[in-house]
C-alpha cells in the first residue's frame, strides 16, 4: 500500500546537498536506504531498487508491488493497477480523479498511455522479480470467490467491487 504523508530528510551540515528544499514527488520506503547511504558517502549496492531522494530532480516513475499479486505504476500522474489474481487492470488519471473512482482502462483516449505503462511495468518486473512472469506476462490465478479464500491477507479489489481501487 501507500501512505500519503510528507517525508522529511535532513542531510548532514557539511554535505553538498541542498537544504530547506521542498520537493513534491513520489517516494518509496525503498528510497530511504540509498538516501542514507549517499549521505554517508557509501556506494549503493547494485541490487537496491530505491533512489537517493536528495538527487532526484525530475518526476519519477513510481512502481508498487503488494504480495507479488497486486502491482501499480504511476507516471505523469496516470496510475495503472494490475491484479494477477483475476488478471484485472485499472487505469486512473489522478489529475482528474484523485479518489480513483473512474476506471479508464476501456477509454480509447487512454489506450496508448495504458500500453506504455504496461510495457514499463513488465520491464520493471522482468528486472527485479522475473519469477512473477511467464512469456513476458504476469502469472495469473483465479480471483478469490469470497473472503474465506484469503486467510490473513488483504482482500484485494475482487472482494466486493471490481471497479474500485483499493491499492492504497
Report each predicted region and the residues it spans.
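Active-site beta-strand termini and strand-to-loop segments that position acidic
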Residues: 11, 73-76, 82-83, 94
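Short, acidic/polar N-cap/turn motifs at the starts of alpha helices
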Residues: 50, 69-70
Amino acid at each position: 500500500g501507500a501512505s500519503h504523508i510528507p517525508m522529511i530528510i535532513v542531510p548532514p551540515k557539511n554535505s553538498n546537498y541542498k537544504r530547506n528544499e521542498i520537493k513534491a514527488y513520489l517516494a518509496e520506503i525503498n528510497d530511504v536506504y540509498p538516501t542514507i547511504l549517499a549521505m554517508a558517502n557509501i556506494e549503493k549496492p547494485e541490487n537496491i531498487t530505491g533512489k537517493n531522494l536528495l538527487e532526484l530532480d525530475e518526476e519519477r516513475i513510481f512502481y508498487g508491488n503488494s504480495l507479488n499479486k497486486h502491482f501499480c505504476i504511476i507516471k505523469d500522474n496516470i496510475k495503472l493497477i494490475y491484479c494477477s489474481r483475476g488478471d484485472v487492470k485499472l487505469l486512473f488519471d489522478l489529475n482528474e480523479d484523485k479518489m480513483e473512482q473512474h476506471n479508464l482502462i476501456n477509454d480509447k483516449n487512454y489506450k496508448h498511455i495504458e500500453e506504455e505503462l504496461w510495457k514499463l511495468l513488465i520491464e520493471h518486473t522482468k528486472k527485479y522479480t522475473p519469477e512473477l512472469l511467464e512469456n513476458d506476462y504476469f502469472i495469473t490465478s483465479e480471483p478469490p470467490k469470497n473472503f474465506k479464500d484469503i486467510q490473513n491477507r488483504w482482500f484485494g479489489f475482487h472482494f466486493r467491487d471490481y471497479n474500485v481501487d483499493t491499492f492504497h
